[in-house]
């Protein structure tokens, strides 16, 4: 079985259980989930459409946000071929695990590294009909309001790093109706 790990880090060779908080190394059997992980930023706008992790949409909360963030972003998808008996699932029997995620209690040495252009990879998935971009006027108003409230609360309670604040100032100032200044 192939297991994937998506990240922005270009220099991974392995993952050690001793460096993980709970001694578990989580990988996914779903390449698209690994791609979503490689695309992570300070705001997660990838929405799993059917709770089966086979189709995603991206909530484009500001005009051209997806393109602005990901146009030249590079990610890496690492993989290994491994015995299914070496991996476990947190989900109860008969329930599909979140993001097709499985864990091992053994160190992992990757056998393959794939450098991907995040934007181009998602456009390929869009052509196949398993990825879409939902424009702001089609996003539920409650989602936009809740997102705005969440990030404003995070900022107002000093839970944002300087890098997060700079990210929001650069890409999403319209969503939050304010220009944050790092204190």
Language model feature labels by segment:
Residues 35, 40-183:
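Conserved NAD+-utilizing ADP-ribose enzyme module
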Residues 1-26, 39-42:
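ADP-ribose/NAD+-binding catalytic cleft of ART/PARP-like enzymes
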């Amino acid at each position: 079985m192939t297991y994937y790990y998506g990240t922005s880090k270009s220099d991974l060779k392995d993952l050690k259980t001793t460096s993980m908080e709970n001694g578990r190394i989580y990988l996914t059997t779903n390449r698209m989930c690994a791609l979503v992980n490689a695309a992570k930023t300070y705001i997660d706008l990838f929405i799993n459409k059917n709770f089966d992790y086979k189709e995603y949409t991206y909530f484009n909360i500001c005009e051209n946000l997806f393109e602005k963030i990901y146009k030249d972003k590079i990610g890496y998808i690492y993989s290994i071929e491994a015995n299914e008996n070496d991996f476990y699932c947190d989900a109860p029997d008969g329930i599909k695990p979140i993001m097709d995620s499985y864990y091992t209690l053994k160190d992992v040495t990757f056998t393959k590294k794939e450098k991907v252009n995040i934007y181009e990879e998602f456009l390929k998935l869009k052509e196949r009909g398993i990825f879409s971009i939902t424009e702001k006027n089609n996003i539920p108003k409650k989602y936009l309001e809740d997102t705005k409230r969440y990030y404003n609360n995070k900022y107002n309670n000093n839970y944002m790093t300087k890098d997060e604040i700079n990210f929001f100032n650069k890409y999403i100032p319209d969503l939050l109706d304010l220009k944050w200044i790092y204190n």
